[in-house]
Amino acid sequence: IRSIIVSGKGQHIEITADVFIDGTGDGDLGALSGATIEKGNENNVMQPPTLMFNLGGVNFEEFCDFIEQHPEELPYDVLDNIAQGYNADFFRKTKSFIFLGMHHLLEELRKKGECPVDRETVIFIRQPMPGQVAVNTIRLLNFDGSNLHDLSNGEMEAHLQIPKLMKMFRENVPGFENCYLDSINASIGVRE
């Protein structure tokens, strides 16, 4: 790369340099220059991006009671191998935690054709504000973060998944019956 043309505010400016550093996070500079770009794993499958959103109105005590009565909703590898203390007592005592689970709930909803996302678990992060969680459960499959059409379609699809996930939480997860949408992150997060 010997030069690049940047555009903004109605202007096109050519910049020359001995070295360019691509700070886009997506390899845009290399891709646009025709460089070979590696994407995804050995099968060229990329990790799905997500869109984080925050819910308020969550009753954590009711949620902890549910987990205490249904420990099968925690991942087996967590129960057996990773952390024996990852349970309802941990959630009650910890002001901020990452929850990973609900495999059985999603499987039951999938059998009924009511699972709103194609994934195995729900992920949310308890926030410092009372009754708030940041949800990381959106799933966008067959997505290329370097493709403009995928980015546009992904934004739309992610926003369409939010009300479906909220409905799932309200109708199926104790403690979430009165949850409401507090905020949505500005854009989808592309990991690779």
Roles of regions detected by a PLM:
Residues I1-R2:
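A conserved short coil-to-beta-strand element within the FAD-binding core of flavoproteins
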Residues S7-V19, G23-T24:
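Core beta-strand elements of the Rossmann-like FAD/NAD(P) dinucleotide-binding domain
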Residues Q11, A31-M46:
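Glycine-rich beta-alpha-beta "Rossmann" dinucleotide-binding loop(s) and their flanking helix/strand
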Residues T24-G25, M46:
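FAD-binding core of FAD-dependent oxidoreductases
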Residues G40-E192:
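Mobile, glycine/GP-rich and aromatic-enriched active-site lid/loop segments adjacent to catalytic centers
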